Amino acid sequence: DDKYTNVGSLKETDFEAVESLNPDLIIIGGRQAEDIDSFKEIAPTVNLAVDGQDYMNSFKTVVTDLGKLFDKEDEAKKAIDEIEAKIEKVNKTVKEKGLTASVVMANEGNISAFSAKSRYGLIYNGLGFAEVDKNIDDSTHGQQVSFEYFLENKSDYVFVVDRGAVTGKGEAASKLFDNEVMNKTEVAKNGNIVYLNSVIWYTMTGGIESTNQMIDEIADAVK
């Protein structure tokens, strides 16, 4: 769209393009955090990335700050209240059913598992799923696992983020998971492998609309 200026990609910012816009304020997310000093040379800069390990508290802080910044405090509070109500409803359903989950990312044929202390902590800490594996390495990129992992760690749900759907690389996660080993698992037999909207879960977490969609996806899965 011609009305928007291209200022780079998710990983590489075109600082000359940013400077040409002569901004009064620059708001960045987690992917640009390491370049914050370069942004500050252009204009005052704030990092409003949401912390996945403490998603809701971080989300509320960010939305509240944005409400103050743009004189939309009432709208910000309303959005937070509505999302908290939705989370409480899903959390209640999940807890009543005693559901467990594994959260994984498919990336060019590899599978990585993520814990409650990871970027996908909302599923555990907010929406109430119990971790089936409490010994996952909490690195940024998760812990690489094989499909046999799901035979040993039997969760009620497996939530899959397909990085390849965002980057355009690798086989689709749904095809990757359709294999002899995975098809032996109860989670596959029960139809509880859930392929999440990867654009949102991988690149757009933290927004009001994206958070609503994230919660709705999980709510639909556990109806």
Predicted regions and their residues:
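Alpha-helical, coiled-coil/dimerization segments enriched in small aliphatic residues
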Residues: 113-143
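A short, structured surface patch at a secondary-structure boundary
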Residues: 1-20, 31
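Structured C-terminal subdomain patch of bacterial secreted/periplasmic proteins
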Residues: 156-223
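Proline-aspartate-enriched helix->loop->beta-strand connector
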Residues: 22-28, 44, 150, 154-158
